[in-house]
Amino acid sequence: MAQLDTLDLVVLVVLLVGSAAYFTKGTYWAVPKDPYAASGPAMNGGAKAGKSRDIIEKMEETGKNCVIFYGSQTGTAEDYASRLAKEGSQRFGLKTMVADLEDYDYENLDKFPEDKVAFFVMATYGEGEPTDNAVEFYQFISGEDVAFESGASADDKPLSSLKYVTFGLGNNTYEHYQAMVRNLDAALTKLGAQRIGDAGEGDDGAGTMEEDFLAWKEPMWTALSEAMNLQEREAVYEPVFSVTEDESLSPEDEAVYLGEPTKGHRDGTPSGPYSAHNPFIAPIVESRELFNVKDRNCLHMEISIAGSNLSYQTGDHIAIWPTNAGAEVDRFLQVFGLENKRHSVINIKGIDVTAKVPIPTPTTYDAAVRYYMEIAAPVSRQFVATLAAFAPDEETKAEIVRLGSDKDYFHEKISNQCFTIAQALQSVTSKPFSAVPFSLLIEGLNKLQPRYYSISSSSMVQKDKISITAVVESTRLPGAAHLVKGVTTNYLLALKQKQNGDPSPDPHGLTYTITGPRNKYDGIHVPVHVRHSNFKLPSDPSRPIIMVGPGTGVAPFRGFIQERAALAAKGENVGPTVLFFGCRRRDEDFMYADEFKTYQEQLGDKLQIITAFSRETSQKVYVQHRLREHSDLVSSLLKQKANFYVCGDAANMAREVNLVLGQIIAQQRGLPAERAEEMVKHMRSSGSYQEDVWS
């Protein structure tokens, strides 16, 4: 028998742990809820404090026969849930309600009435994990010993009365693609629930999420109509919200929200705990450009969280709450005929008691569009189609109908240009769509979402200050006449310009209300919160680490190296620390080059930085090529139980690195490719292979 080396032993241990996981169903290491994501009260509707957490009771009280649950991290799944609720109501007469999974308890789901239906719109987050708001529900429903009020066991098929529909949101560049919806579907089926139609799956990695959703929902509605004896009717717009102008109020009134995220912020008394529902208005204490070449800028910012009671750990994420650019706000208001009413005060209320108003109210049209609505996102075909009834003339209506019904035509005219809703309508006609109800715009557009960035500092070195590293997005798509500009990165660049003395910052021609609502962000402040990540250094600093981070993928690894240098300075035994970093040219976009030299001096031969410059030679060289060239080093460190980390592009780089690592293991150990692939998978499941990637 061949002698087992360290990596083989690690794999053997993982197999044993995996077996235990199978038989305990994760009881001892269930996915923890984000400790930084303290739940905040909903603005309207939902299961507020003091309200029932019994979904069946809630449906009976409000006369609903269809509940659409969502597990959402960035708002997309919530948006799809709202769209399904609206369509079910308008086309089929269903009495629908949208429900946040964390607002309810599920011990009585075995009493779900046979004449009702539940939808589950589930995003998969990170490495096959539930979104923050779905953690408790998922742990309950997928548990081996799931217990319902009736006391029935899984063998008794306790959910036999539950009819359900599922749609999953995922990204095929991640290993655990659609894990949530697939695992949920399996759990519900095991418990006897009856799925109606196919389990839908939308793929963000392939860029087909919207079309996947549209293709799935039509046969789903057919199946649901048959199962519940529904009759389709002509869909007529029925507002979910009432929007009324209030002439008794002006923007100067203290009761009016002008962009503040919460009542406390509006009243000038913000207080913690700060979370995804309640950001901290943090001062930016330093900002600079790491490089500025041609069409690209890269920012480094230091954000103070002193006095906020916010904390972070090295490897966590910071969320930046952006503001829409003034030019896009003006365009939107002009397209919908609201330019002259931008400062009119409006009240927004849910017509249905279960409707959750996504915007603080009262507010103004300008504030709603500038601070609360995702107006700069690519528009969906379905949303464009809903505007046909409100077109300014018949010719425009015919074009809108064609765009909404012809997938290829929409792709050619709208998707290829990455048009926002306002740009799409401007491409059809110069006439304003003044007849579109503002309620329809609130319903059809997502709430403006925070953007997450890998923290590029060590909490050990600077616990009250968070570093971020971000490339400013400004991209010209092939065939497009305009630049696609990142909402948040250009906002950050404007803040940097202002902080560094520019009296009128206008990155890529964009301007922002930098001082924020009622000048509350004056002095260069930005709303933030912190999100926990499992992307962490090993607890034993002597353990080797291999990091692969091209471009801004280097961000968390700056924090890792910063921390190891600090530990070494304290006399700790620090293990081999290897970074594979890639960029275009060493004299163009090699960020933190001087800083890394300092860390090299501090860590000596414990730190090795291996670079890949893709544009310096005729043959492009990427980090995966350097990884293969240093296969002996990689293999040696893996035998020493090294942790392996990847940060950056999921679609190409991360996939290639995963493939190359398997090839290195196979080559160095004389193993079949299939066995090496299994070893990489076991590294992932054990936590010794970690990714922080995006597409």
Curated annotation (Swiss-Prot):
Protein topology in the membrane: Single-pass membrane protein
Highest taxon above the source species: Eukaryota
GO cellular component entries: cytosol; endoplasmic reticulum membrane; mitochondrial outer membrane; plasma membrane
Location of the FAD-binding FR-type domain: 277-538
Residues annotated for FMN binding in this entry: 72-77, 123-126, 169-178, 204
Enzyme class: oxidoreductase
GO biological process terms on file: ergosterol biosynthetic process
Binding positions for FAD per the UniProt entry: R451, Y452, Y453, S454, T469, A470, V471, G486, V487, T488, T489, W694
Location of the Flavodoxin-like domain: 66-221
GO MF terms held by the record: flavin adenine dinucleotide binding; FMN binding; NADP binding; NADPH-hemoprotein reductase activity
Transmembrane intervals: 9-31
Reaction(s) catalysed (UniProt annotation): 2 oxidized [cytochrome P450] + NADPH = 2 reduced [cytochrome P450] + NADP(+) + H(+)
Entry-linked Pfam families: FAD_binding_1, Flavodoxin_1, NAD_binding_1
Lumenal side: 1-8
UniProt entry keywords in alphabetical sequence: Cell membrane, Endoplasmic reticulum, FAD, Flavoprotein, FMN, Lipid biosynthesis, Lipid metabolism, Membrane, Mitochondrion, Mitochondrion outer membrane, NADP, Oxidoreductase, Steroid biosynthesis, Steroid metabolism, Sterol biosynthesis, Sterol metabolism, Transmembrane, Transmembrane helix
Location of the protein in the cell: Endoplasmic reticulum membrane; Mitochondrion outer membrane; Cell membrane
Binding site for NADP(+): R296, T552, S614, R615, K620, V621, Y622, V623, Q624, E656
Co-factor binding comment: Binds 1 FAD per monomer.
Function: This enzyme is required for electron transfer from NADP to cytochrome P450 in microsomes. It can also provide electron transfer to heme oxygenase and cytochrome B5. Involved in ergosterol biosynthesis.
Family designation: Belongs to the NADPH--cytochrome P450 reductase family. In the N-terminal section; belongs to the flavodoxin family.
Protein name: NADPH--cytochrome P450 reductase
Species whose genome carries this gene: Aspergillus terreus (strain NIH 2624 / FGSC A1156)
